[in-house]
């Protein structure tokens, strides 16, 4: 009897230890990126771009010359950037600190200074590019194509980000360039079909609700990136063909990096949203 009891007791202790190890493992994985999934709404703060020797970190932009590739170039050198021979332009956070997801950060009125410098400074600080400041905004109606587009959205699955940034627009030298991913529909031709995320979305610059009926979700590949659920550190990267202007046929390469801050899609002071 003593041997049987000891055997049973030993097996019981082993089972308890195994269960404890299983729970501990589950607890560790719950804090990691593998279990994180769903839509992310709030502010994606930008880390300013920095350079250390040949290493670039933080947020940055570069432009691929026609027939080049985002990985190998050749890249268009920006005469106002000292980084890697001008082939990388460092970005800094704007007045909102970064990219708002679930709403818009539209181009202000006016959108340019008398010298053609962009005044879009909510997402990123306007940055010098060939003697003129360029900025970025997200708009319910794309400034270049005049197409209605959806508000930015980001989804995480197992530490990987997929983002709709169709509304992303760059402004420079009194000119507008859609730099979204997926790409906004062209100015001419049929509207690319898409399903709006919400009937209305808040504009953090204009401080009002904007309609999203019949807004396009764009065409082509989305922005992609990484997300660490523990630290909330993220990266987002995409490419977008430049159409029109002096850089027609070039491709913009955007890299955003920083920390995600969950928050509502509109401020608490916003009036109630109505569908009409």
Where are these regions (language model features)?
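Extracellularly exposed regions in secreted/surface proteins, prominently low-complexity, repeat-rich
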Residues: 209-218, 223-276
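Composition-driven, intrinsically disordered low-complexity tracts enriched in small residues
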Residues: 29-38, 44-45, 191-206, 267-276
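N-terminal segment immediately downstream of the Sec signal-peptide cleavage site
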Residues: 30-97, 238-264
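C-terminal motif of bacterial Sec signal peptides marking the signal peptidase cleavage site
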Residues: 24-27
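Predominantly extracellular/secreted and cell-surface proteins with exposed
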Residues: 63-213
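Sec-dependent N-terminal signal peptides
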Residues: 14-20
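Extracellular structured ligand-interaction cores
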Residues: 41, 151, 158-160, 233, ...
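Bacterial N-terminal signal peptides that target proteins for export
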Residues: 2-14
């Amino acid at each position: 009897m003593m041997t049987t009891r000891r055997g049973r007791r030993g097996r019981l202790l082993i089972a308890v230890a195994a269960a404890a190890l299983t729970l501990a493992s589950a607890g560790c994985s719950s804090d990691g990126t593998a279990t994180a999934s769903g839509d992310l709404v709030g502010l994606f703060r930008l880390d300013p771009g920095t350079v250390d020797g040949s290493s670039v970190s933080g947020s940055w932009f570069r432009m691929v010359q026609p027939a080049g590739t985002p990985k190998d170039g050749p890249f268009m050198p920006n005469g106002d950037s000292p980084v890697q021979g001008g082939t990388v332009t460092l970005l800094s956070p704007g007045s909102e600190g970064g990219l708002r997801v679930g709403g818009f950060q539209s181009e202000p009125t006016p959108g340019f200074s008398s010298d053609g410098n962009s005044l879009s400074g909510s997402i990123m600080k306007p940055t010098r590019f060939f003697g003129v400041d360029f900025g970025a905004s997200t708009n319910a109606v794309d400034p270049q194509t005049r197409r209605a587009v959806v508000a930015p959205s980001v989804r995480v699955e197992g530490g990987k980000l997929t983002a709709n940034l169709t509304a992303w627009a760059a402004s420079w030298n009194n000119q507008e360039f859609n730099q979204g991913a997926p790409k906004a529909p062209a100015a001419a031709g049929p509207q690319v079909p898409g399903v709006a995320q919400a009937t209305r979305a808040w504009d953090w610059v204009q401080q009002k609700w904007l309609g999203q009926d019949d807004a396009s979700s764009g065409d082509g590949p989305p922005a992609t990136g990484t997300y660490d659920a523990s630290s909330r550190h993220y990266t987002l990267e995409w490419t977008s063909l430049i159409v029109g202007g002096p850089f027609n046929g070039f491709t913009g390469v955007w890299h955003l990096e920083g920390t995600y801050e969950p928050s509502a899609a509109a401020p608490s002071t916003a009036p109630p949203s109505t569908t009409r």
